[in-house]
């Protein structure tokens, strides 16, 4: 179930402070964060945010289409390597 509109978007306070500081100074360095649960807000447009996926920080460049989504949606946590091949089918 989606979040109620009257509550507004959730964003961690420490991340919000980092975003405001980066926008104010015009800094283009990636912002490191572990907060995958924070929602992308309009003030983040044009920033690169390095989102932690459990192993490393994945750089995510924020665009207009991403507003309203969560940061974790753009940093996949699992790698799919495909299913094991069938040995009988390989011989044919």
Swiss-Prot record:
GO terms for biological process: ribosomal small subunit assembly; translation. SUPFAM superfamilies: Ribosomal protein S19 (SSF54570). The keyword ATP-binding does not apply. Keywords: Ribonucleoprotein, Ribosomal protein, RNA-binding, rRNA-binding. Pfam families: Ribosomal_S19. Transmembrane segments: none annotated. One of its GO terms (cellular component) is small ribosomal subunit. It comes from the Bacteria. GO terms for molecular function: rRNA binding; structural constituent of ribosome. NCBIfam families: rpsS_bact. Protein S19 forms a complex with S13 that binds strongly to the 16S ribosomal RNA. Belongs to the universal ribosomal protein uS19 family. HAMAP family: Ribosomal_uS19. This is Small ribosomal subunit protein uS19. It comes from Vibrio campbellii (strain ATCC BAA-1116).
């Amino acid at each position: 179930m989606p979040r109620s509109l009257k509550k507004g978007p959730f964003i961690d306070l420490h991340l919000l402070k980092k975003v405001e500081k980066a926008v104010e100074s015009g800094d283009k360095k990636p912002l490191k964060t572990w907060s995958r649960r924070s929602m992308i807000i309009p003030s983040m447009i044009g920033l690169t945010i390095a989102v932690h996926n459990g192993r490393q920080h994945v750089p995510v460049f924020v665009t207009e289409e991403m507003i309203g989504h969560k940061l974790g949606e753009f940093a996949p946590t699992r790698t799919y390597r495909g299913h094991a091949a069938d040995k009988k089918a390989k011989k044919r």
